[in-house]
Amino acid sequence: MLVAVGSGSNVDDPDTHPEEKNRADILEFNPDGGDPSIYAYGIRNAGGGIAFSPETGELWCSVNERDGLGDNLVPDYITHVQQGGFYGWPWWYMGGHQDPRHEGKHPELKDKVITPDVILHPHNASLELTFYNGKQFPEEYQGDIFAAEHGSWNRSVRVGYEVIRVPLHQTGHATGEYEDFMTGFVVDNGHVWGRPVGVTVAQDGSLLVTDDGSKSIWRVSYTGK
């Protein structure tokens, strides 16, 4: 069993904050109930969404990154997860970019930081993801990722507040591209009336989206072009 455990803070250093031990990790538990092992680490908060690709069997996650570096840092992301991989938190991000709040710490980790597959807007607050395996949408949607973007709370211009589609082109692999799929939760004056949280495929092949802004569950159905 794999469990995503978010960090207990924004960027507290586990070296000096022992309460961060085994946080910002994806942990692997065995049925015997023994101590967990670390499947991947340095993932600040993937608690919103982990799922296995039906095409490749790989684990994927959507990640809420850290705050406090302005509007344009640090990007949230969606990525397949390499077992044993390090994704940067809290010292590094997006490959070899060091968080200035931890300048000079852990230089030995710089070249180990994995760059994610799909880079999103900073503060998008990417939550649950799912792979489309229904029969209602067109064939080109098969195996693609849908992800709920809860929306920013600390950015001067709002981002997120939508469901995005990550095309995997029936290969199970991302190219870095993504597209808006379900939008309209931000009105012209910048006010927000909906915030997507969860997304799943219904038995009839439609897409169900939970929204804690309007306290609704939306059904997205395909009726033809």
What kind of region is each of these model predictions?
Residues 1, 57-59, 207, 217:
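Hydrophobic residues embedded in beta-strands of well-ordered beta-sheets
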Residues 4:
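A conserved catalytic-loop motif detector
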Residues 7-37, 41-182, 188-194, 202, ...:
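Beta-propeller domain segments
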Residues 66, 214-215:
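Loop/turn residues immediately N-terminal
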Residues 197-213:
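C-terminal substrate/ligand-recognition segments
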